[in-house]
């Protein structure tokens, strides 16, 4: 699945944001905990010297359900993030999965806790995220299995965000893991 999304920080009060988003179909609120892992022996599976993650392994717990995800980020010629290829499956036994991760030699990189308030319209999933220790974010995502012009899709997403008339940042071009790495100055020694 190709996920094409734009992530922006939101500076308005949550009540104003929610009031604006309530015109879309509300899908619910989910509390999530994401634990990211790195491999000390694989350069592609740990932050690079620019504190950027090209590939990551994530364990997500969402309302007592557990998912394992491997993400591969795709960048343009200037190093700007375009989209992620994501491979995800649900699993039942978190304790067994943690044993497998430990046996593989993977190490915990960071944990992100957030509350996701999700809406949908006919094209996008729109998520207001309250991220512990980071703030409020709006993620607008278009998912497809088809070959599409990523830059054109992102232009359309940006137009949609602009139409919301919220006080937001420019596109962040990094995910919450990278923001957390930078905020906490996490460095993985070789």
Segments (PLM) and residue ranges:
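Mixed-charge, glycine-accented linear interaction segment located at domain edges/termini
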Residues: 146-175
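N-terminal strand-loop-strand beta-hairpin
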Residues: 1-123, 167-190
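C-terminal accessory/tail domains of diverse enzymes
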Residues: 62, 134, 146-148
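Coil-to-beta-strand transition motifs
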Residues: 1, 133-136
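An amphipathic alpha-helical core segment
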Residues: 125-133, 143-145
């Amino acid at each position: 699945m190709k996920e094409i999304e734009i992530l922006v920080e939101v500076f308005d009060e949550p009540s104003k944001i929610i009031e604006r988003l309530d015109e879309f179909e509300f899908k619910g609120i989910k509390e999530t905990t994401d634990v990211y892992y790195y491999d000390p022996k694989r350069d592609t599976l740990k932050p690079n010297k620019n504190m950027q993650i090209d590939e990551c392994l994530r364990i997500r717990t969402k309302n007592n359900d557990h998912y394992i995800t491997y993400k591969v980020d795709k960048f343009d010629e200037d190093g700007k993030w375009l989209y992620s290829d994501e491979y995800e499956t649900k699993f039942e036994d978190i304790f067994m999965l943690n044993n497998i991760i430990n046996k593989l030699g993977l190490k915990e990189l960071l944990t992100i806790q957030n509350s996701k308030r999700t809406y949908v319209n006919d094209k996008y999933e729109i998520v207001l995220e309250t991220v512990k220790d980071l703030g409020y974010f709006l993620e607008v995502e278009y998912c497809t299995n088809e070959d599409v012009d990523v830059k054109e899709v992102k232009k359309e997403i940006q137009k949609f965000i602009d139409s919301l008339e919220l006080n937001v940042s420019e596109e962040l071009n990094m995910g919450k893991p990278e923001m957390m790495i930078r905020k906490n100055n996490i460095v993985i020694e070789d």
